[in-house]
């Protein structure tokens, strides 16, 4: 049994134990949500705390959006800093809102970590400034709970359990996976690989994954990477690893940068396995390019809309978009570029007609970019950014 399978088995055993404890009863389980909060916060027993927390999470998840807003605002009013100190001095630092401890206790319930991630996702979707503090405080907690040292890197292949493969199809954010044949083409061949980070408490749901093409040199279009009828190569012949799709899986974890650690760990692992690999690069979309042209180069934008934009004009605008910045922090205009440059990569090449899909044409008129991860200098590049 693999290490990862052991994690899943341990988590499932813990869930079954909690279900057995729940059936024994630990006092009244209040259907009044505010009383249910009091039960979670006032109990001192480890097992009873888990049972009360599980019950409260069920109540929270059953609330509609208006009910959730009311519950959270009541929580702010009743459990804010410097209030109820007497009741909670044993379970929290006095300078911290009491409801932070509530979330810590909810995290201990069955599948609590995942459910709190989904709760933050809901809170963000409400777009209520009064609830911003919950978004920020949960993010702070998640940065501890999802520390990279806790994460497990797993290779995803065609033999991976179907429930996880379904998640890969669902979460793919860059190049849509339209069928199981499409997925198989990205996972089964020896020159195509996929890696994901998992959290031990969310073992059946990836946090982020990257798809990798092993090639000879850098192709000029994404279609040469993802087409079903492409020519496969022997893995020993590859000299280049191309990270062509990176997908974050949970909106409730926005603000936590897993990608930096994922790419570098995968690159180093591949280099150990395949010493002949000498290039590690991305094949990246330019999701903001057309919007940028509409504002900063409107004549070129109109020509593109009319399909009358020449290559030289496109390249000139793309270079400006990717290398100049209208941002106060001086980082690249393009969000994908910011991510990779922020990780220590450097812009290597701009490719015309690289993504001729409807999505590729609408967001960047088919242009894509390569960002090079030079493992020898990537950390040095990163340090220069933060000087």
Predicted regions and their residues:
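Extended, Lys/Arg-enriched charged tracts that mediate electrostatic binding to polyanionic substrates
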Residues: 144-223
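Acyl-donor binding region in acyl/amide transferases
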Residues: 228-345
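N-terminal low-complexity, Ser/Thr- and acidic-residue-enriched intrinsically disordered segments
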Residues: 1-172
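Flexible loop/turn segments at secondary-structure boundaries
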Residues: 219-220, 250-252, 287-292, 356-358, ...
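Conserved small/polar residues in nucleotide/adenosyl-binding loops
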Residues: 385-387
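A general structural signal for short secondary-structure junctions and capping/turn motifs
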Residues: 157, 184-189, 197-204, 232-234, ...
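A structural signal for short, well-ordered beta-strand segments and their strand-loop junctions
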Residues: 196, 211, 279-285, 349
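C-terminal/domain-terminus segments
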Residues: 337, 347-373
